[in-house]
């Protein structure tokens, strides 16, 4: 199954021991407990295009506003992990580590590309792992219950400025469950809420394709809680990916590709590979096929679509089949069985948060690639 660049392979780099330097960059959990902090793996920041505004916003929130909880949302392939890895590089690549913004920078994957979809560390495993790292392996006889472990972790987050990252949060959320946690993983909700509401020196960044339940309420209650919805690359930044791969295109050809794929970096890279492999690097030959969704692009969209509720799927179907913007009253008339305006409004908000629909003065629409994916369901 295709994994987006949010799950890219990590790059090994030397660990700085805490007794000699002030910043520790810790190995991602995959998802076993890390026994010590003497070596580490960090997500690799490869060639990076654009995202200047997003990086500036994140730096403002973290360094100036001292936000305690940040969620980065976006469709698969948008480069959420790459964005945060680039951000973290600014905190860890300084030659003068004593001046680093954080003493600890710790990244945890709640699911890795090599593991099954439903395999994720329990909140007890994650909390115990973090406490061992922050205590220099000195913490013993730790409590077993999540609320007690959270209280223990908060002591360290209050004493020391740490940057924590939880990646792939959607892997512990229910499919079609409106942001509800899978049974046995509800403790992550308590952890997120506590970090967002408590007073401390640290910051937790959550990376996910969809938000957990009640996050929007938490964001509205606390000024230290922020949400960044990652959209596609700007046209000029996406174009740089094609130019770096030696593909020549006219402005009209590039505009078609950008409109079809919404600036999704991973999908653009998949298209580049196909153009080289099947069409000798000629973009016009690829466009002449009139096919937007195929192979790994189909798999990527299918992963996202299959997580939706039945009503969310119905809304996407209605918009895709109509192929023109629709307002809420028009959507209400098309949905069978009928639903209330309140339920539809909540569904539209959920889809908008996940960047699966777009809205403007003309109404609600879906992107071209998602439209083709949906219509292909009726042809198969």
Where are these regions (language model features)?
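Amphipathic alpha-helical scaffolds
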Residues: 74, 83-84, 173, 177-191, ...
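A structural signal for repeat-array scaffolds
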Residues: 87, 91, 216, 336-337, ...
């Amino acid at each position: 199954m295709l994994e987006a660049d949010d799950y890219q392979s990590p790059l090994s780099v030397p660990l700085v021991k805490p007794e000699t330097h002030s910043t520790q960059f810790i190995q991602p959990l995959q998802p076993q407990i890390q026994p010590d902090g003497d070596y580490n793996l960090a997500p690799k920041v490869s060639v990076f295009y654009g995202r200047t505004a997003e990086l500036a916003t994140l730096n403002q929130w973290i360094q100036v506003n001292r936000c305690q909880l940040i969620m980065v949302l976006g469709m698969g392939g948008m480069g959420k992990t790459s964005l945060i890895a680039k951000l973290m590089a600014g905190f860890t690549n300084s030659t003068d580590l004593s001046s680093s913004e954080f003493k600890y920078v710790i990244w945890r994957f709640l699911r890795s590309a090599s593991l099954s979809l439903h395999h994720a560390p329990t909140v007890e495993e994650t909390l115990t792992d973090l406490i061992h790292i922050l205590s220099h392996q000195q913490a013993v006889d730790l409590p077993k219950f999540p609320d007690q472990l959270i209280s223990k972790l908060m002591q360290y987050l209050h004493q020391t400025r740490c940057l924590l990252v939880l990646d792939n949060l959607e892997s512990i959320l229910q499919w079609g469950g409106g942001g509800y946690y899978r049974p046995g993983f509800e403790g992550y909700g308590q952890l997120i809420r506590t970090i967002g509401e408590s007073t401390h020196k640290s910051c937790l960044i959550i990376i996910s394709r969809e938000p957990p339940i009640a996050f929007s309420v938490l964001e509205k209650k606390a000024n230290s809680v922020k949400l960044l919805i990652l959209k596609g690359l700007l046209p000029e930044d996406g174009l740089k990916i094609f130019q770096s791969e030696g593909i020549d295109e006219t402005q009209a050809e590039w505009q078609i590709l950008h409109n079809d794929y919404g600036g999704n970096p991973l999908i653009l890279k998949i298209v580049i590979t196909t153009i080289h492999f099947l069409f000798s690097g000629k973009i016009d030959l690829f466009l002449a096929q009139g096919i937007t969704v195929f192979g790994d692009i189909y798999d990527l969209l299918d992963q996202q679509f299959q997580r939706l509720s039945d009503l969310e799927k119905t809304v996407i179907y209605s918009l895709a089949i109509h192929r023109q913007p629709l307002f809420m009253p028009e959507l209400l008339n098309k949905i069978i069985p009928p639903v209330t305006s309140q339920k539809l409004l909540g569904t539209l908000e959920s889809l908008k948060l996940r960047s699966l629909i777009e809205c403007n003065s003309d109404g609600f629409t879906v992107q071209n690639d998602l439209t083709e994916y949906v219509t292909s369901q009726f042809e198969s």
